[in-house]
A protein has these predicted regions:
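Extracytoplasmic
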Residues: 35-37, 57, 516-521, 533-537, ...
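Pro/Thr/Ser/Gly-rich low-complexity, intrinsically disordered linker/stalk tracts
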Residues: 390-424, 471, 489-501
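Recognizes extended acidic, P/S/T-rich segments that occur
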Residues: 429-470
Length: 730
């Protein structure tokens, strides 16, 4: 198609799609990003970038809710759409910390477990058997706003279409619409490939409901990527896909979204502008030398991009990032690099988060030295900001701008005050007043919202002091954000009437227990409190007797006690919230010893049981059979029913810890223990090196002999290796 006719067609499609919408607003960008040989250009200026990869600007995996049990994959999560304020905040955080471009994750594809998990997706099944997939309008309006915010704030976007994997639904789920297989996605005569091309057409020709522009006219869209980690990309697949994208989006760039290699056929394809690679340890390419190796393979024929790398210590990430910044082969350099991965502020306070199988957490901007210390968060954020500055010709990163005002959320309680943090705020001060205009008193200083594993069901950013408030009075609150560059203007003001009167803790305790002198007794109390005047509740056990009762831990709700003589004992448990307290008493009847008493009623270290002491149950399989390796680890528990069983001893009935020596060398996984034929106790194991590590699992055992099974039970996943177990009590 000739260029002029093509442009006329684009204009006609745009007008038809707008359907009477308001005229398109003017873009905040002057130019589309273009390619000049192996270099990206913004007008006549070289365009390079570094950042932290933000996969979820358009769809959020809400890890705080945990896995969806209705999804048999085990790790299936809950997802939701971000709010417009969240998208604005996240993009602002990136831009204000130096980002110029960002790659997001793919368009999600409907799959069979979505309904049970309440998940919505971007791509819906066709309405007829041989029809084309449909775009979910609700999802695409969120996508519209992401693009509009990126344009408004000056962030270029790389947008991949379909995933090789099934995390969000990918090629396998697309193929399932047509009763084809995942590999048919790469076969250009398949129904799946035809559907893939139609999804591309629908997306690129969509009119943005926020800007009024067709997607192919959005300057914020730097490039379309064929997909995420499409490692089986072949020449025909790429040739047809890239040409199809260029047909509909002639002003935007095309990325070959392959993985682990540079495709030689991509280098000669006239419609491919950028070749990309992802660096990860499991791909054996997560090192600085990969940059030069790939640049040599590209040979200056295309732009080269490191679309993802990460899950390494900060010093190793910095070595790779500095290689991206400085490596040069015959004048060609990498256009950019993105470290995996970012999560942003929640609408109602705190941050979203994600934990990888390696134990690494997502990074929060602008970085939190204390809260993110174990994750080396501040070091990672700083190395990325430094790289972005170097790519812009500067030696050091610019200071952060002063933060904008946070957004204080309405509440009905002065003990549950939350706000959406400022994009680059590091800490916050909370002020209270008796009137909406002040005078204001600071009641909370240097509060951080950068805590990892934030749970909105159980956590709040600020609780006022109960002792300073009067019941029935109305109080007013506002918040200011701070960072090293200054303080924000105050937030909006909210009013709260204090109507919560402190109540004493409610204690639950069995009224009577029976034991013998040689066994001792396990004491288990529970309590509930209203969280007033604070969430701190002191607990303790007492016996007003003659010293014949001994507690292992008198300051814990669950502990053990033993007795120097038979008799009847009244043991009292108390929960004290600081103003009010409650107590309950259990009567323990202690008979004479029926066996030998243990030397220590509180501590126990049993035998270490290796896999040689266990009994194996091996399921028949053509591959990955359960076996003991030369390193002494048993694995990989690849088939449901694979298990190892031990007979272990316990000195008394009650709670113990199981020291498990395991190896998670191939990534995180989920396996289960079964004690004495009970229900499987599921355990999430992190990734380790080949030496393995220990994990402590709480178990309930009976006095004497117990059977402990470990294996792959229903719902378990991943390859696992185990070496030994040991029963302990401390």
């Amino acid at each position: 198609m000739k260029p002029m006719k093509n442009l006329l067609l684009m204009g006609l499609l745009s007008a038809l799609a707008a359907g009477g919408a308001l005229a398109a607003e003017r873009s905040h960008f002057t130019h589309f990003i273009t390619r000049d040989g192996a270099t990206l250009k913004d007008g006549d200026k070289v365009f390079r970038f570094a950042g932290i990869h933000a996969p979820e600007l358009h769809r959020i995996e809400d890890d705080a809710r945990g896995p969806c049990r209705a999804d048999p994959r085990g790790w299936g999560q809950y997802f939701k759409w971000p709010t417009a304020q969240e998208q604005q905040n996240w993009i602002q955080a990136m831009v204000q910390t130096g980002a110029k471009a960002q790659r997001v994750y793919v368009l999600s594809v409907q799959q069979e477990f979505d309904k049970a998990c309440g998940r919505e997706t971007h791509i819906l099944a066709p309405e007829t058997a041989d029809g084309m997939p449909r775009l979910n309008e609700k999802a695409m309006r969120v996508y519209d706003n992401m693009i509009a915010e990126a344009d408004k704030q000056g962030l270029r976007l790389i947008l991949p279409f379909i995933d090789h994997w099934w995390w969000w639904g990918g090629r396998e789920q697309l193929a399932a619409f047509y009763h084809e297989k995942a590999e048919d996605f790469y076969r250009t005569d398949s129904k799946t490939f035809k559907a893939y091309l139609d999804v591309i057409r629908q997306v690129i020709t969509r009119t943005n409901t926020v800007t009024g522009r067709a997607y192919y006219d959005e300057k914020a869209i730097m490039a379309w990527e064929t997909g995420n980690e499409l490692e089986d990309t072949n020449a025909d697949f790429l040739h047809q896909t890239a040409a199809w994208i260029k047909k509909w989006a002639p002003h935007q760039l095309v990325v070959d979204g392959t993985y682990k290699k540079i495709n030689s056929f991509a280098l000669t394809d006239p419609n491919v502008d950028i070749v990309s690679n992802h660096y990860y340890t499991n791909a054996d390419n997560n090192h600085p030398g990969q940059v030069t190796q790939d640049l040599r393979a590209v040979g200056g024929q295309k732009v080269y991009l490191v679309g993802e790398f990460g899950l390494l210590p900060a010093d190793q990430l910095n070595a790779i990032m500095q290689s991206i910044v400085h490596s040069e082969v015959n004048g060609a350099q990498a256009a950019g690099g993105l470290i995996w991965g970012f999560r942003g502020h929640r609408h109602d306070g705190g941050f979203y988060w994600h934990k990888e199988s390696t134990g690494h957490y997502s990074y929060h901007l602008p970085g939190f030295a204390k809260e993110g210390e174990a994750n080396q968060e501040q070091a990672v954020v700083d190395l990325v900001r430094t790289a972005a500055a170097q790519m812009a010709g500067q030696q050091t990163m610019a200071p952060l701008p002063k933060p904008d005002a946070p957004l204080l959320r309405e509440t009905t309680s002065p003990f549950a005050i939350n706000w959406m943090g400022a994009a680059v705020g590091r800490s916050y001060d909370v002020e209270r007043a008796a009137s909406p205009t002040g005078p204001w008193t600071v009641v909370g200083r240097d509060i951080s919202d950068g805590v990892n594993e934030w749970n909105p069901e159980t956590m709040v950013l600020f609780r006022d002091d109960y002792r300073q408030l009067q019941l029935g009075h109305t109080y007013y609150y506002r918040v200011t954000a701070k960072n090293e560059s200054g303080r924000s203007a105050p937030s909006n003001v909210i009013s709260v009437q204090h109507s919560e009167e402190n109540q004493p803790p409610v204690v639950t305790l069995e009224p009577a227990l029976t034991t013998t002198q040689d066994q001792g007794v396990e004491l288990t109390a529970s309590w509930q409190d209203d969280g007033l005047p604070s969430r701190e509740v002191k607990v303790g056990w007492q016996h007003a007797g003659d010293g014949q009762v001994h507690f292992c831990h008198a300051d814990r709700a669950q502990t053990r006690a033993w007795f120097t003589a038979p008799g009847t004992y009244a043991l009292t448990f108390t929960a004290d919230d600081g103003l009010l307290k409650s107590s309950k008493t259990v009567t323990v009847t202690v008979g004479e010893a029926t066996g030998k008493a243990p030397a220590d009623f509180c501590r126990y270290h049993g035998e270490v049981y290796g896999v040689a002491e266990g009994r194996l149950t091996v399921m028949k399989s053509d591959k990955d059979a359960l076996t003991v390796g030369e390193d002494g680890f048993l694995g990989p528990f690849a088939n449901e029913g694979d298990k190892v069983s031990w007979q272990v001893q316990a000195p008394w009935s009650g709670q113990f810890l199981l020291n498990v020596t395991f190896n998670g060398k191939w990534g995180g996984k989920q396996n289960s223990f079964v004690v004495n034929g009970g229900a499987p106790q599921t355990v999430a194991f992190p990734q380790t090196d080949e030496q393995g590590q220990q994990l402590r699992i709480p178990v309930t055992l009976k006095a004497g002999s117990n059977q402990i099974d470990f294996g792959r039970f229903a719902g378990d996943w991943g390859y696992m290796f185990i070496k030994s177990i040991e029963v302990v009590a401390e």
